[in-house]
């Protein structure tokens, strides 16, 4: 894979983006994987392949074009006509997911610290705005800094329930409601598409800022491996306690609190941090699509953007997830298929290819 310090930083930043809108709360894993028993791990591997290999290809394209936003990469993948369609669909729905995460941060502040939802969302909005004033290298560093702590916490929870969980691996299929291979594969594809769509614009921009294609590709692949391991561990933890947490709003927090309330508190802080990661990455990508980063127009745009995001967050966390997530999974799968077609076509034509 050829990992170096820069590639590891890219990998952690990539993971930091996708877990915020993906599986940090555990609710998403409960919907897309856990109910399908051991078949769900096929879906986990499919999702990991999408994040790793397809992310690698896209990061290398971003490096080749020295991209600051996803526009040139979409043109390379789809051609000029269709790229505009996906450009506008992607950019506005990614902004919608950022709004969803702001709403989610308000709910998390309220549930864990009894802070009013509106105030929690406002705190997150202000922190995001202040971070967007920093240069891009500092933003990438901010995106990756929490990922190692998330890895440690997820491993701790998974190991604990490996030895103390009510349900063993051999009992999983007899406990969950649907042991369906088809659903495990299908929802793994959709979830992989969702996570990839969330990380797409950011991994393009990170790739554009990388020193070499080999480095950006290795970083994205490394991020995909970390993502797959974390996803499998969280899924396993939820399955070992499925009857107890199947109706929980934030299942991973319930698992952590069952071990020790202090672990629950630490996980709450980490969850807020990964939500911050996702909101930051998506808002930067949205602003960079319409303005030159750090120009006068950029500074005006991010003020308007963050005010709009805060106001729209009052629609509510659950309602926003129901509308956006499955649609974004389908959009992401269109991009994944297009990247694969481009990859194999250029390989087959024996052309010198970007990725």
Name what the model sees in each region.
Residues 5-24, 43, 90-94, 98, ...:
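Hydrophobic, membrane-embedded alpha-helices of multi-pass small-molecule transporters
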Residues 2-5, 35-39, 64-93, 111-117, ...:
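Transmembrane-helix boundary/entry motifs in multi-pass membrane transporters
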Residues 71-80, 230-276, 317, 322-334:
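TM-loop-TM module centered on a large, flexible mid-protein loop between adjacent transmembrane helices
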Residues 21, 91, 95, 128, ...:
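Hydrophobic alpha-helical segments and their helix-loop junctions in multi-pass secondary transporters
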Residues 71-77, 101-121, 208-228, 281-304, ...:
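Helix-loop-helix connectors at the membrane interface of multi-pass transporters/channels
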Residues 34, 61, 101-111, 125-146, ...:
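Membrane-water interface regions at transmembrane-helix termini and the short interhelical loops
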Residues 9-17, 44-49, 86-95, 111-135, ...:
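Transmembrane alpha-helical segments of multi-pass small-molecule transport proteins
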Residues 45-71, 233-237, 241:
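Juxtamembrane transmembrane-helix boundary signature
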């Amino acid at each position: 894979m050829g990992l170096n310090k820069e590639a590891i930083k890219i990998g952690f930043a990539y993971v930091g983006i996708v877990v915020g809108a993906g599986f940090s709360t555990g609710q998403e894993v409960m919907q897309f994987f856990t109910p399908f028993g051991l078949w769900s791990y096929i879906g986990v591997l499919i999702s990991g392949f999408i994040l790793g290999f397809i992310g690698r290809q896209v990061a290398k394209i971003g490096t080749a074009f020295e991209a600051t936003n996803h526009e040139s990469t979409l043109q390379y993948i789809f051609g000029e006509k269709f790229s505009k369609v996906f450009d506008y669909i992607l950019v506005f729905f990614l902004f919608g997911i950022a709004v969803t995460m702001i709403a989610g941060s308000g709910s998390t502040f309220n549930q864990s610290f009894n802070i009013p939802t509106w105030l929690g969302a406002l705190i997150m909005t202000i922190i995001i705005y202040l971070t967007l004033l920093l240069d891009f290298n500092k933003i990438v560093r901010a995106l990756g800094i929490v990922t190692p702590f998330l890895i440690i916490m997820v491993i701790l929870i998974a190991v604990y329930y490996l030895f103390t969980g009510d349900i063993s691996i051999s009992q999983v299929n007899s406990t969950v409601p649907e042991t369906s291979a088809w659903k495990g594969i299908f929802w793994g594809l959709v979830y992989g598409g969702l996570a990839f769509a969330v990380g797409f614009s950011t991994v393009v921009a990170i790739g554009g800022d990388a020193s070499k294609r080999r480095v950006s590709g290795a970083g994205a692949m490394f991020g995909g491996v970390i993502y797959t391991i974390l996803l499998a561990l969280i899924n396993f933890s939820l399955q070992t306690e499925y009857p107890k947490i199947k109706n929980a709003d934030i299942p991973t927090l319930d698992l952590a609190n069952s071990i020790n309330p202090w672990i629950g508190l630490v996980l709450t802080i980490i969850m807020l941090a990964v939500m911050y990661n996702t909101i930051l990455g998506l808002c930067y990508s949205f602003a960079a699509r319409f303005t030159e980063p750090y120009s006068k127009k950029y500074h005006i745009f991010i003020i308007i953007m963050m005010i709009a995001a805060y106001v729209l967050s009052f629609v509510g966390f659950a309602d926003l997830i129901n509308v956006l997530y499955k649609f974004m999974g389908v959009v992401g799968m269109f991009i994944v298929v297009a990247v694969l077609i481009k990859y194999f076509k250029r390989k087959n034509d024996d052309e010198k290819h970007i990725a």
